C-alpha cells in the first residue's frame, strides 16, 4: 500500500520489521530498499542538502548500485551541484566498474570536461578495450573541444562496437570538421545499425 501511495518514508520505517519477520527474500528486501531510496531521492530532487543527507545515510552497496548512483548524480546536476554529481560517479566507479555508470559520466555536463577527460584517460590505461569507456572518452573530448582526439576515440569505439547513437555523434563531428563524405557514410551506417535502411529503389539525381 505504501509503495502504491509512494510513501517512501513510511516504507523505510517498515523495512526493519520486514527484515526481522523474514516475510520476504533477501533479494526482494534489497530491491524494496533500493526502491525506497530512489523514491526519496526523487522527492528531494531540488534540495541539494536533502539529497546529500539521503545519500550519506544510504548503505555502501546502494552507493555503488548503477541505477541509484546515476539517478543521484542526475538529480544533483539538475539541482545545480555539478561537482557533487561528478564526484559521486567517480567514487562509484572506483568501487564498482559498470558500463551504464561510465556512460552517465560521459554525458555529465559538469563544466569540467577536461578534468573528467583526464580521469577517464587514467581509467583507460587499465581498461583499453572497454567500449563504454571509449564512447565516454569521445564525448568528453567533444566537450573539451579536442576534435582530433574525439575523432580517434569515436573511430576506436565504432571499430569495436558499432551502434546508431555513436554513428550519429561521429557523423556530426565529421560534418563539423568539413568531411562531408565521411559524415554521409556514418549517417548511412547509423540507419543500418538502427535497422532503418531501406532496400526500396530510389531515384538518382540527373
Where on the chain are the PLM-derived regions?
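Solenoidal tandem-repeat scaffolds enriched in leucines and small polar residues
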Residues: 1-57
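Residue at a conserved register position within TPR or TPR-like alpha-solenoid repeats
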Residues: 2, 76, 104-109, 141, ...
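Single-residue signature of alpha-solenoid repeat helices
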Residues: 11, 50-51, 85, 116, ...
Amino acid at each position: 500500500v505504501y509503495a502504491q501511495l509512494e510513501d517512501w518514508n513510511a516504507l523505510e520505517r517498515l523495512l526493519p520489521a520486514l527484515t526481522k519477520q523474514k516475510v520476504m527474500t533477501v533479494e526482494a528486501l534489497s530491491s524494496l530498499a533500493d526502491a525506497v531510496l530512489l523514491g526519496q531521492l526523487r522527492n528531494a530532487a531540488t534540495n541539494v542538502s536533502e539529497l546529500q543527507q539521503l545519500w550519506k545515510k544510504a548503505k555502501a552497496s546502494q552507493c555503488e548500485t548503477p541505477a541509484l548512483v546515476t539517478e543521484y548524480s542526475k538529480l544533483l546536476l539538475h539541482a545545480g551541484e555539478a561537482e557533487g554529481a561528478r564526484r559521486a560517479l567517480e567514487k562509484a566507479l572506483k568501487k564498482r566498474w559498470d558500463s551504464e555508470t561510465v556512460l552517465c559520466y560521459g554525458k555529465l555536463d559538469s563544466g569540467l570536461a577536461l578534468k573528467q577527460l583526464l580521469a577517464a584517460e587514467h581509467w583507460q590505461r587499465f581498461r583499453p578495450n572497454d567500449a563504454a569507456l571509449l564512447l565516454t572518452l569521445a564525448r568528453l573530448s567533444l566537450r573539451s573541444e579536442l576534435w582530433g582526439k574525439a575523432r580517434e576515440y569515436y573511430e576506436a569505439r565504432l571499430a569495436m562496437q558499432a551502434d546508431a547513437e555513436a554513428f550519429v555523434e561521429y557523423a556530426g563531428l565529421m560534418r563539423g570538421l568539413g568531411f562531408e563524405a565521411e559524415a554521409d557514410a556514418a549517417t548511412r551506417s547509423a540507419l543500418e545499425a538502427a535497422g532503418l535502411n531501406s532496400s526500396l529503389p530510389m531515384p538518382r539525381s540527373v
